[in-house]
Regions:
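Pocket-lining segment of extracytoplasmic ligand-binding domains
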Residues: 93, 124, 165, 174-268
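Bacterial N-terminal signal peptides that target proteins for export
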Residues: 2-13
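C-terminal motif of bacterial Sec signal peptides marking the signal peptidase cleavage site
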Residues: 21-23
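Conserved C-terminal helix/tail region of periplasmic/extracytoplasmic solute-binding proteins
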Residues: 303-335
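Short, glycine-/small- and polar/acidic-enriched structural segments
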Residues: 32-164, 168-172, 181, 188-194, ...
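Bacterial lipoprotein signal-peptidase II cleavage site
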Residues: 25-32
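Soluble non-cytosolic domains of exported or imported proteins
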Residues: 69-73, 88, 142, 146-147, ...
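Secondary-structure end/capping motifs
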Residues: 232-314
């Protein structure tokens, strides 16, 4: 027996060592994996997909597990339940959660888009469109309480219209069915995201006549949120994530729409190149893509004002309570 132990001793030691290495490797892999849930899969988030396709996250040693949350409520639920490390969603979601005084503090630490991403689609081309033309019309709109709808109502008020009084806003259609509903005859106008708006225009069934993003100003429209506890436990992961994102943002800011479209084509296999380029170009022209992850206080306050005017601000949450600029500041400074 002793002889057998001596005979297999070296092999047993090597096996134990190999298992130890495997365990360490597995632990390291798990530590560097980030479960990211996006509120929807959209061309509006091009810098994120560029960061993935160009390998910027991998350069930071991060393995991104990307999931479509299919809506703001579901996306926030995955974060609060611990099924996501980071979520990409409207900043208003963090305000709603914080205002409810839950035991789980949520912070916004990086910004991806800085304008609304919807467009006004008409049934007929209107070369000299004015927002006042919506008076007395039926607008196929977005759901109540979401940023797209609040921005729509803000733009209407700025242009002398009273939402729901001067403009009949239709809000009983699910987000995913808005494009089809408009094509089928619902509404005189529709507020639509890309690429739905451009596809309808390409088919000659509608015409983009105005941009809600262009006429509502800059605000932290879509941001990355995480639990404050997760940020404290994984500051290195948060900083590396933000650094990779910043690389993607800078790449999009310095490359033409054609190259951006080519870089993210694999993420949108069902969208033609022509539509991809057109959509990216529109978003670049109106500066929808934030060039840095830094969430500015002035833009955050603009968001609060839009929510307040819409009657959807449950509580005014101070900038410093909701926004963590530590990691964005560091990566922009090159740290």
């Amino acid at each position: 027996m002793t002889k057998k132990i001596r005979q297999f001793g070296p092999q047993l030691l090597m096996l134990c060592f190999a298992c130890l290495l495997a365990a360490c490797s597995s632990s390291s892999s798990s530590t560097n994996q980030i479960r990211l849930v996006e509120v929807t899969h959209s061309l509006f988030y091009a810098p994120q997909y560029v960061a993935m396709s160009k390998g910027f996250f991998k350069q930071e040693g991060l393995d991104i597990e990307l999931t479509n949350g299919n809506g703001g409520d579901k996306t926030m639920t995955t974060l609060l339940s611990g099924d996501a490390d980071i979520v990409l969603v409207g900043a208003e979601a963090a305000i709603y959660v914080t205002a409810r005084s839950t035991n789980q503090s949520v912070v916004a630490f990086a910004q991806l888009t800085q304008t609304d991403g919807t467009f006004l689609v008409s049934r007929q081309p209107i070369p000299d469109f004015k927002w006042s033309m919506l008076k007395g019309k039926n607008l196929l709109g977005q759901r109540r309480g979401g940023m797209p709808e609040m921005v729509s109502e803000y733009v209407q008020r700025v242009n002398g219209l009273t939402p729901h009084q001067d403009v009949n806003i239709i809000q009983n259609v699910d987000f995913k069915n808005l494009g089809n509903a408009f094509v089928a005859g619902t509404g005189d106008f529709a507020q639509l995201f890309e690429p739905v708006a451009s596809k309808i225009e390409q088919e000659g069934k509608g015409y983009i006549v105005a941009s809600f993003g262009k006429d509502s100003g800059h605000l932290p429209y879509t941001c990355y949120l995480a639990k404050e506890q997760w940020m404290k436990q994984h500051p290195d992961l948060a900083q590396r994530f933000t650094r990779a994102l910043y690389k993607g943002q800078q790449w999009v800011a310095t490359h033409p729409a054609e190259e951006v479209a080519a870089a993210i084509q694999s993420h949108f296999p069902d969208t033609g190149k022509e539509v991809l380029v057109r959509v990216i170009q529109r978003y670049q022209e109106q500066q929808s893509f934030a060039s840095t992850p830094l969430i500015e206080e002035q833009e955050y306050n603009h968001l609060l004002q839009i929510m307040k005017e819409a009657g959807e601000l449950p509580k005014s949450i101070p900038y410093r309570q909701l926004v963590n600029t530590e990691f964005a500041d560091q990566v922009v400074k090159g740290e």
